[in-house]
Amino acid sequence: MGRGPSIEGRKNASDAKRGKMFTKIIREISVAARAGGGDPSNNPRLRTAMDKGLSSNMSKDVMERAIKKSTGELEGVEYEEVRYEGYAPGGVAVIVDCLTDNRVRTVADVRHAFSKCGGNMGTEGSVAFMFKRLGVLSFAAGIDEDTLTDAAIEAGADDVVVYPEDGAIDVLTAPDAFAQVRDALVAAGLEPAHAEITFRADNDIAVDGETAVQVRKLLDMLEDLDDVQDVYSNVDQAALGA
């Protein structure tokens, strides 16, 4: 009779996953600091990246070193932002955001993932028009809906979405209003469980059977690439068992 993974094996897998997540956060901190300076109070993108690091139990020392490398105080690698677009099986649109120090390597890895899973890469803008860029501040169930809604709208949010199935609430903002809305809500004692600027599809596409399997395989393969920061798609997540 076969045996399941050992405790050590599961720990190693967990450590590897955590290490990969830390690498992505450090790259985001590096690019944000290089673009907007090393002071998070004057750099909303850097503050968001650092908040993500803190919520993942990354030490402040690690983040500070990443900032210093980006601002030239310490020697470090320079990363650039690149975005790729394409289609997964079933006509599912996919956006892949990367931070890389080697574009040739990154595009080859991304193209290989699309090709191996039955998809294809497109040109710039080929699928981006199917998505909206927006800020999302997520709150767990239990927060007072009226209080949050009033504070969010007053702070400049575009919309407040309540999910009746679990009571969670999302506050939606324009990207350039994200920082001011977040700061206003935090100042009012309304701390989001998660906050980010992201892409959301205008409409979801349902897939099933082998197509769903291939779409999931592609998304997982892309997310596992070292240079990939975020992967967005317009697939109906319920179809993938998410």
UniProtKB/Swiss-Prot annotation:
Pfam families: TACO1_YebC_N, Transcrip_reg. It is found in: Cytoplasm. The keyword Transmembrane helix does not apply. Its main location: cytoplasm. InterPro entries: Integrase-like_N (IPR017856), TACO1_YebC-like_2nd/3rd_dom (IPR048300), TACO1_YebC_N (IPR049083), Transcrip_reg_TACO1-like (IPR002876), Transcrip_reg_TACO1-like_dom3 (IPR026564), YebC-like (IPR029072). Belongs to the TACO1 family. This is Probable transcriptional regulatory protein XCV3282. It comes from Xanthomonas euvesicatoria pv. vesicatoria (strain 85-10).
